[in-house]
């Protein structure tokens, strides 16, 4: 079939060649633009959050826009931060007031018995957030764990309580020696310590809490 003196197949072939050439030019432009963007240093990586220069860039993001996807480090969930242990002032109220945070005492069974304080935390390495990366996280309980388990101590008290093993384990050395010499107070002291353990009246001497078994 001839259209305007030219075969239709010839026109189709020319059209396909022109389309192929256009696609090649488009791919070349896209790849060139992508390589320029990859090598050039961006001024802004997100709206309102400027990325700094140097190897410590992740540690000095600036927070300027509340609508930015970059949040303050202090708003990070617990799984993205690492916190120090609560500061122990050992009952020194003056030191606690000067520092502004810390624990006067540790331990407690009920929530109302446990002191709460702020602790120093910092964002984990590799987590991008707006500075400062070190901050205070509030409402941390003043409790510590030193390897004492309730079930283990209860078994010690039940089977070896007459020899004071339970109190030796908890660090009450003086009363443990007395319990050993009297063979558990002829059974009375042994029974009383069982009740104290169950009711929470007998705890580790260092003020720590029972370790949780998961």
Curated annotation (Swiss-Prot):
Residues 47-59 have a biased composition (Low complexity). GO terms for cellular component: membrane. This is TM2 domain-containing protein 2. The lineage of its organism: Eukaryota, Metazoa, Chordata, Craniata, Vertebrata. It comes from Pongo abelii. Residues 40-61 are annotated as: Disordered. Pfam families: TM2 (PF05154). Belongs to the TM2 family. Glycans are attached at residues 37, 92. It comes from the Eukaryota. InterPro entries: TM2, TM2D1-3-like.
């Amino acid at each position: 079939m001839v259209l305007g003196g030219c075969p239709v197949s010839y026109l189709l072939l020319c059209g396909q060649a022109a389309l192929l050439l256009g696609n090649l030019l488009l791919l070349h432009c896209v790849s060139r633009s992508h390589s320029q963007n990859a090598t050039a240093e961006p001024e802004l990586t997100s709206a309102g959050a400027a990325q700094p220069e140097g190897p410590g860039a992740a540690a000095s993001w600036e927070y300027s826009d509340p609508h930015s996807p970059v949040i303050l480090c202090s708003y990070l969930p617990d799984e993205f931060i690492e916190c120090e242990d609560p500061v122990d002032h050992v009952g020194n109220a003056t030191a606690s007031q000067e520092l502004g945070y810390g624990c006067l005492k540790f331990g407690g069974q009920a929530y109302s018995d446990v002191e709460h304080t702020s602790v120093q935390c910092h964002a984990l390495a590799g987590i991008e957030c707006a500075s400062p990366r070190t901050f205070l996280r509030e409402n941390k309980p003043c409790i510590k764990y030193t390897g004492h388990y309730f079930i283990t101590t209860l078994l010690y008290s039940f089977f070896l309580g007459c020899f004071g093993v339970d109190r030796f384990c908890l660090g009450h050395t003086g009363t443990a020696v007395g319990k050993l010499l009297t063979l558990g107070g002829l059974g009375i002291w042994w029974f009383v310590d069982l009740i104290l353990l169950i009711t929470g009246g007998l705890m580790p001497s260092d003020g720590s809490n029972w370790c949780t078994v998961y």
